[in-house]
Amino acid sequence: MASGSPLELLLNNQNISAAEVERQRIKLGLDQPLYIQYFTWIKNFFQGNLGDSYRTGQPVMQMILEGLGPTILLTFAAVIIACLISIPLGVQSARYQNKGWDNGSSVFSFLATSTPSFFLALIFLYVFSVKLKVLPIGGMYDVGKKETIGSLLCHLFMPSVVLAMQLVGSLIQYTRSSMLEVMREDFVRTARSKGIKEKKVIIKHVLRNSLIPVVTYLGMEIPLLIGGAVVTEQVFSWPGIGLIIYQSIFTS
């Protein structure tokens, strides 16, 4: 059970009388036993009624739907960026196994995996927003200006790259392992024995068959990526579900 009560928000207002507090307590159903409150919540949940936010007074379902779009957009952009970075590096790592490309990719994947997202986000903000002043510090659009695609892309760049880094390290290694496994298959050796250029063998035969498990892995990682968006959305003030969750926790 979480500590605190919505009534504490009312009690902070010294002008609220004890009678009004008690009336609100009955209205919210907080006078009922905990098990009654729980089963009431379950019943309302399956009816699509999540109640109203104690913080804003808005229906919770409305807040979720408003935040869902930005979170999906951020996650989609992060997945695209992660694929554009990871798949080429994974391919090169497998192609030049135990050489410079492979060692460099291994170091990069280690750094991407081990660096906390909030730390990377602060570095991005300091470099691109404070020092270089080329990217906005937060939000989804420029405040007080027309909402344009250009403004959206500028605001989307940093949080999507930071979120993508959570996926890049493991995706590089997964692509590399999948490539190496396919490269040992007989049909690859047959293609090489026919004199087909190595680049064509890698792209047409190896990569095409390696992407099947990679796509499956991506499908499993996307829900975790959405969960990891909480910190990223909070740092960049991105108006998604993660920011709503963060604000709700600390308000309560």
Map each language-model feature to its residues.
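Transmembrane helix irregularities
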Residues: 2, 112-115, 226
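Flexible, glycine-biased helix-capping/connector loops in cytosolic signal-transduction modules
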Residues: 5, 46-48, 185, 228
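Residue-level recognition of pore/gate-forming positions within transmembrane alpha-helices
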Residues: 15, 83, 110, 126-127, ...
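An internal, D/E-rich "acidic patch" concept
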Residues: 31-87
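Alpha-helical transmembrane segments of integral membrane proteins
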Residues: 65-101, 117, 146-252
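Membrane-water interface segments at transmembrane-helix boundaries in multipass membrane proteins
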Residues: 106-115, 119-170
